[in-house]
Every structure is written in C-alpha cells, then in structure tokens.
Amino acid sequence: MNPTRYARICEMLARRQPDLTVCMEQVHKPHNVSAIIRTADAVGVHEVHAVWPGSRMRTMASAAAGSNSWVQVKTHRTIGDAVAHLKGQGMQILATHLSDNAVDFREIDYTRPTCILMGQEKTGITQEALALADQDIIIPMIGMVQSLNVSVASALILYEAQRQRQNAGMYLRENSMLPEAEQQRLLFEGGYPVLAKVAKRKGLPYPHVNQQGEIEADADWWATMQAAG
C-alpha cells in the first residue's frame, strides 16, 4: 500500500466513534440497510447492529456486508439480545418514536455513548423495543407528511450526533480508540484487498502491517499465499 493510502486509513481509524451506533430492528429493504450503513461510515460509526430473526438473518447480513466493507454489522436474533449487548457497553438507547415522552432529537446529548434504534419500514419499532429504550425521540414534521424514510431519518439523527461530537473535539484524536487487532484487520483489508481475499480463502491469519504500511510476514506465510489452490 502506498503512503497516501496508509495515512488515509490511519486517519479514518483515529476518527472512528466506537461508542456511537445504530440498531436496525427488522429493517428489511436492502437499499435502506445499505443507505444506513453508508451514512454510519460517513459519520465515523465503526459497527452497526441489526435484529433479523429466523431465516432472514443470513440473507440480510449478506446484503449489509456488501454495503460497506469499513463498517461491521453485528446481528442479533432478538431485540432483547441487542439492547442487553448495547447497554452492557454503557450506551443510552434512543428510540425514534412519537410518544407523550418523546423529545426533539436535537435535544439529546450525543457525546454520550449512544445507540439510535430504528424500526421496520412499515410497522416501526416494536413495543418490546420501546419498553427497553431509555428515551423516545422525534424529528419535528411541519408539513403534510407524517414520517420520513428510515434511512433519511437515521441520517438526520446521525449527523446531529456528528455535529455535537465534532464541536466537542471527538474527531480530533491522534490515536484510534479501536482495539489494535481491529485496526490491523482494517489496515490489511483496506490496504491489501486482493491479498486479504486470498488469506481468507486459505484460512491464513492476517499478517502485521507496520507503520510504513508494509506487510510483515515470514517466508512460510508468503509461500502458502503463493501456492496454487
């Protein structure tokens, strides 16, 4: 990988916000899933979460994985599992839902560890999910339409989170908050995508990428990579 590419990936890693995420509860249209993931990447989200029960899990996970190779998609079989995982990371759970207790999405402090919960396109967030959320939020609507597309709504909220975090200097870190192993994975997959595919296919561990963006691997690793099959 050339120095420019290495520097760009390192800059991206330093700006990643591991304590900001989105959870999609049965969002089932691939174009919406893809759009949400692209926006998540644009504001520095490292990992998004999705609840896809039963047989839809594999299909939707595959569609999501193809949306953006820089954003991880963690799937959960139930919303209870997802929320328990996220609250275990100290995140506030915000549900996009009109209720008597809902507040304008811009009134929330997004510099706190935050998960934005988005519901299924037609039916919205389930009652089970609403009961688990910490706060309902709304996007004010002053026209004739009553709702926005789920990917549009998530984009508005994510960019408010990005605005607040940028003002707080949370994108100015010199070092990434991601674990070293995760940084190495992204450096190799992003800097050497062809080699990464071969290594995956052959079941080889990823090599170390040094501070010059160069691969550090022994002769046996290279020999296995170059062998036919």
From Swiss-Prot:
GO molecular function: tRNA (guanine(18)-2'-O)-methyltransferase activity; tRNA binding
Enzyme class: transferase
InterPro entries: Alpha/beta_knot_MTases, rRNA_MeTrfase_SpoU_C, SpoU_MeTrfase, TrmH, tRNA_m1G_MTases_N
CDD domains: SpoU-like_TrmH
Reactions performed catalytically: guanosine(18) in tRNA + S-adenosyl-L-methionine = 2'-O-methylguanosine(18) in tRNA + S-adenosyl-L-homocysteine + H(+)
Binding site for S-adenosyl-L-methionine: T96, I139, L148
Any one GO biological process: tRNA methylation
Pfam families listed in its UniProt record: SpoU_methylas_C, SpoU_methylase
Enzyme Commission designation: 2.1.1.34
Record keywords: Methyltransferase, RNA-binding, S-adenosyl-L-methionine, Transferase, tRNA processing, tRNA-binding
HAMAP family reported for this sequence: tRNA_methyltr_TrmH (MF_02060)
Function: Catalyzes the 2'-O methylation of guanosine at position 18 in tRNA. Type II methylase, which methylates only a subset of tRNA species.
Family named by the database record: Belongs to the class IV-like SAM-binding methyltransferase superfamily. RNA methyltransferase TrmH family.
Protein name in UniProt: tRNA (guanosine(18)-2'-O)-methyltransferase
Source species: Escherichia coli (strain K12)
